[in-house]
Amino acid sequence: MSYSLKGLLKRPVHLFVKPPAVEGEYPARGELYYVKGSNGSGKSTVPSYLAENDPQAYVVTYNGKIMLTVCPSYNIICIGKYDKSKSKGVDSLKDTEQMLFALSIADQPEYLKYDVLFEGIIPSTLLSSWIPRLTRPPRELVVLFMDTPLETCVSRVKSRNGGADFNESLVVEKWERVHDHSQRHKGLFPTVPAGMMKSNGLTIEQAVFAFLNRDFGSID
Protein backbone atom coordinates (compact mmCIF):
# COMPACT_ATOMS: atom_id res chain seq x y z
CA MET A 1 0.00 0.00 0.00
CA SER A 2 1.20 3.50 -0.81
CA TYR A 3 1.05 6.12 1.95
CA SER A 4 1.13 9.89 1.50
CA LEU A 5 1.85 12.59 4.06
CA LYS A 6 -0.78 14.74 2.32
CA GLY A 7 -3.62 12.67 3.77
CA LEU A 8 -2.92 13.44 7.43
CA LEU A 9 -5.46 14.98 9.81
CA LYS A 10 -5.27 16.05 13.46
CA ARG A 11 -7.95 15.55 16.11
CA PRO A 12 -7.95 16.43 19.83
CA VAL A 13 -7.94 13.52 22.25
CA HIS A 14 -10.11 15.37 24.77
CA LEU A 15 -13.11 16.77 22.91
CA PHE A 16 -15.38 17.67 25.83
CA VAL A 17 -13.92 17.31 29.32
CA LYS A 18 -10.22 18.15 29.47
CA PRO A 19 -7.86 17.15 32.28
CA PRO A 20 -6.20 20.00 34.20
CA ALA A 21 -3.09 21.68 32.85
CA VAL A 22 0.11 19.70 33.33
CA GLU A 23 2.35 21.10 36.04
CA GLY A 24 6.08 21.31 35.46
CA GLU A 25 8.20 21.19 32.34
CA TYR A 26 9.39 18.03 30.63
CA PRO A 27 11.91 18.92 27.92
CA ALA A 28 12.63 16.49 25.11
CA ARG A 29 16.05 14.85 25.03
CA GLY A 30 16.29 14.21 21.29
CA GLU A 31 15.65 10.49 21.76
CA LEU A 32 13.49 7.66 20.43
CA TYR A 33 12.57 5.04 23.05
CA TYR A 34 12.09 1.46 21.87
CA VAL A 35 10.28 -0.21 24.77
CA LYS A 36 10.43 -4.01 25.00
CA GLY A 37 8.39 -6.22 27.29
CA SER A 38 6.04 -9.20 27.34
CA ASN A 39 2.27 -9.16 27.69
CA GLY A 40 1.35 -7.69 31.06
CA SER A 41 4.70 -5.97 31.57
CA GLY A 42 3.22 -2.46 31.52
CA LYS A 43 4.64 -1.24 28.20
CA SER A 44 1.58 0.86 27.45
CA THR A 45 1.10 2.22 30.98
CA VAL A 46 3.21 5.37 30.59
CA PRO A 47 2.02 6.43 27.12
CA SER A 48 -1.61 5.75 28.11
CA TYR A 49 -1.19 7.96 31.17
CA LEU A 50 0.38 10.76 29.12
CA ALA A 51 -2.46 10.73 26.59
CA GLU A 52 -5.13 10.64 29.30
CA ASN A 53 -3.62 13.48 31.33
CA ASP A 54 -2.41 15.94 28.69
CA PRO A 55 -5.17 18.47 27.91
CA GLN A 56 -3.30 19.36 24.71
CA ALA A 57 -3.03 15.77 23.46
CA TYR A 58 -4.09 15.09 19.89
CA VAL A 59 -3.93 12.26 17.39
CA VAL A 60 -2.66 12.29 13.82
CA THR A 61 -4.79 10.14 11.52
CA TYR A 62 -4.48 8.76 8.01
CA ASN A 63 -7.68 7.58 6.32
CA GLY A 64 -9.29 7.46 9.76
CA LYS A 65 -6.48 5.36 11.27
CA ILE A 66 -4.65 6.79 14.28
CA MET A 67 -0.93 6.86 13.49
CA LEU A 68 0.42 9.06 16.29
CA THR A 69 -0.71 10.23 19.71
CA VAL A 70 1.01 13.54 20.40
CA CYS A 71 1.40 14.80 23.99
CA PRO A 72 2.77 18.36 23.74
CA SER A 73 2.69 19.00 27.50
CA TYR A 74 5.20 16.17 27.94
CA ASN A 75 7.08 16.70 24.64
CA ILE A 76 6.39 13.08 23.69
CA ILE A 77 5.00 11.43 20.57
CA CYS A 78 3.59 7.94 21.07
CA ILE A 79 3.42 5.77 17.95
CA GLY A 80 -0.09 4.35 17.47
CA LYS A 81 -3.22 4.92 19.52
CA TYR A 82 -3.78 5.04 23.26
CA ASP A 83 -7.48 4.95 24.04
CA LYS A 84 -9.76 2.49 25.83
CA SER A 85 -9.43 -0.20 23.15
CA LYS A 86 -7.43 -3.38 23.75
CA SER A 87 -4.75 -2.87 21.09
CA LYS A 88 -2.44 0.02 21.88
CA GLY A 89 0.80 1.42 20.53
CA VAL A 90 2.17 -0.11 17.37
CA ASP A 91 0.01 -3.19 17.99
CA SER A 92 -2.88 -0.98 16.85
CA LEU A 93 -1.24 -0.58 13.43
CA LYS A 94 -1.81 -3.06 10.63
CA ASP A 95 1.68 -4.16 9.68
CA THR A 96 5.36 -3.21 9.50
CA GLU A 97 4.74 -0.88 6.57
CA GLN A 98 2.16 1.07 8.56
CA MET A 99 4.48 1.22 11.57
CA LEU A 100 7.25 2.65 9.39
CA PHE A 101 4.84 5.18 7.90
CA ALA A 102 3.89 6.34 11.40
CA LEU A 103 7.58 6.76 12.20
CA SER A 104 8.06 8.78 9.01
CA ILE A 105 5.33 11.16 10.19
CA ALA A 106 7.18 11.62 13.49
CA ASP A 107 10.29 12.45 11.44
CA GLN A 108 8.61 15.52 9.91
CA PRO A 109 10.08 18.91 10.94
CA GLU A 110 7.10 19.98 13.08
CA TYR A 111 7.54 16.90 15.28
CA LEU A 112 11.31 16.84 15.69
CA LYS A 113 11.00 18.91 18.87
CA TYR A 114 9.43 15.87 20.56
CA ASP A 115 10.87 12.59 21.79
CA VAL A 116 9.26 9.41 20.43
CA LEU A 117 7.95 6.37 22.32
CA PHE A 118 7.62 3.15 20.28
CA GLU A 119 6.20 0.04 21.94
CA GLY A 120 4.27 -3.10 21.04
CA ILE A 121 4.35 -6.83 21.64
CA ILE A 122 5.42 -7.75 18.09
CA PRO A 123 8.54 -5.53 17.93
CA SER A 124 9.32 -6.50 21.54
CA THR A 125 9.92 -10.13 20.65
CA LEU A 126 12.21 -9.48 17.67
CA LEU A 127 15.89 -9.35 18.51
CA SER A 128 17.47 -7.18 15.85
CA SER A 129 15.23 -6.23 12.92
CA TRP A 130 13.85 -3.08 14.55
CA ILE A 131 17.20 -1.67 15.66
CA PRO A 132 18.16 -0.36 12.17
CA ARG A 133 14.57 0.71 11.46
CA LEU A 134 14.48 2.81 14.62
CA THR A 135 17.91 4.33 14.13
CA ARG A 136 16.58 7.62 12.79
CA PRO A 137 18.87 10.64 13.27
CA PRO A 138 18.72 13.29 14.57
CA ARG A 139 17.02 11.39 17.39
CA GLU A 140 19.16 8.92 19.31
CA LEU A 141 17.75 5.42 19.72
CA VAL A 142 17.47 4.18 23.31
CA VAL A 143 16.24 0.63 23.98
CA LEU A 144 14.28 0.19 27.21
CA PHE A 145 13.45 -3.20 28.71
CA MET A 146 10.56 -3.46 31.18
CA ASP A 147 11.72 -4.56 34.65
CA THR A 148 8.44 -6.34 35.47
CA PRO A 149 8.86 -9.86 36.95
CA LEU A 150 7.34 -12.80 35.09
CA GLU A 151 4.92 -13.58 37.92
CA THR A 152 3.48 -10.06 37.74
CA CYS A 153 3.07 -10.25 33.96
CA VAL A 154 1.20 -13.56 34.22
CA SER A 155 -1.02 -12.22 37.01
CA ARG A 156 -1.92 -9.11 35.02
CA VAL A 157 -2.82 -11.09 31.90
CA LYS A 158 -4.98 -13.40 33.99
CA SER A 159 -6.73 -10.40 35.53
CA ARG A 160 -7.38 -8.89 32.10
CA ASN A 161 -9.04 -12.14 31.07
CA GLY A 162 -11.33 -11.99 34.07
CA GLY A 163 -9.61 -14.98 35.63
CA ALA A 164 -10.43 -17.20 32.65
CA ASP A 165 -7.92 -19.78 31.48
CA PHE A 166 -5.32 -18.61 28.99
CA ASN A 167 -2.17 -20.00 27.46
CA GLU A 168 0.31 -19.00 30.15
CA SER A 169 3.19 -20.55 28.20
CA LEU A 170 2.86 -17.82 25.56
CA VAL A 171 3.46 -15.12 28.17
CA VAL A 172 6.36 -17.08 29.65
CA GLU A 173 7.94 -17.57 26.22
CA LYS A 174 7.71 -13.87 25.36
CA TRP A 175 9.02 -12.80 28.77
CA GLU A 176 11.99 -15.14 28.49
CA ARG A 177 12.71 -13.95 24.96
CA VAL A 178 12.74 -10.27 25.95
CA HIS A 179 14.85 -11.08 29.02
CA ASP A 180 17.33 -12.88 26.77
CA HIS A 181 17.46 -9.81 24.50
CA SER A 182 18.33 -7.61 27.48
CA GLN A 183 21.19 -9.94 28.45
CA ARG A 184 22.59 -9.97 24.92
CA HIS A 185 22.01 -6.33 24.01
CA LYS A 186 25.40 -4.84 24.89
CA GLY A 187 27.27 -7.56 23.03
CA LEU A 188 25.14 -7.29 19.91
CA PHE A 189 24.55 -3.52 19.86
CA PRO A 190 27.40 -1.89 21.80
CA THR A 191 26.69 1.58 20.35
CA VAL A 192 22.96 1.58 21.15
CA PRO A 193 22.17 2.86 24.67
CA ALA A 194 19.85 0.67 26.74
CA GLY A 195 18.26 0.66 30.17
CA MET A 196 15.43 -0.73 32.27
CA MET A 197 12.08 1.06 32.26
CA LYS A 198 10.98 1.09 35.89
CA SER A 199 7.63 -0.44 36.75
CA ASN A 200 8.16 -3.17 39.33
CA GLY A 201 6.88 -2.13 42.75
CA LEU A 202 5.86 1.34 41.59
CA THR A 203 2.47 2.98 41.34
CA ILE A 204 1.43 4.21 37.90
CA GLU A 205 2.26 7.78 38.91
CA GLN A 206 5.71 6.75 40.17
CA ALA A 207 6.45 4.85 36.94
CA VAL A 208 5.40 7.86 34.87
CA PHE A 209 7.52 10.19 37.02
CA ALA A 210 10.54 7.93 36.56
CA PHE A 211 10.10 7.94 32.79
CA LEU A 212 9.54 11.69 32.53
CA ASN A 213 12.77 12.23 34.45
CA ARG A 214 14.50 9.58 32.33
CA ASP A 215 15.27 7.64 35.48
CA PHE A 216 16.15 4.30 33.93
CA GLY A 217 17.72 1.29 35.58
CA SER A 218 20.80 -0.54 34.31
CA ILE A 219 20.57 -3.71 32.21
CA ASP A 220 23.71 -5.06 33.91
UniProtKB/Swiss-Prot annotation:
Protein role: Phosphorylates 5-hydroxymethyluracil (5hmdU) into 5-phosphomethyl-2'-deoxyuridine (5- PmdU) on DNA as a step in the pathway leading to thymidine hypermodifications in the viral genome. The phosphate is added internally to the DNA polymer. As a final result of the pathway of hypermodification, 5-aminoethoxy-2'-deoxymethyluridine (5-NeOmdU) substitutes for about 40% of the thymidines in the viral DNA. These modifications probably prevent degradation of viral genome by the host restriction-modification antiviral defense system.
Pfam families referenced in this protein's UniProt entry, alphabetically: HMUDK_HMUD1
Family indicated by similarity: Belongs to the thymidylate kinase family. 5-hmdU DNA kinase subfamily.
The name this protein goes by in its record: 5-hmdU DNA kinase 1
Catalysed conversion reaction: 5-hydroxymethyl-dUMP in DNA + ATP = 5-phosphomethyl-dUMP in DNA + ADP + H(+)
Naturally occurring in which organism (per UniProt): Salmonella phage ViI
BP-aspect Gene Ontology terms: symbiont-mediated evasion of host restriction-modification system; symbiont-mediated suppression of host innate immune response
Keywords of the record: Host-virus interaction, Inhibition of host innate immune response by virus, Restriction-modification system evasion by virus, Viral immunoevasion
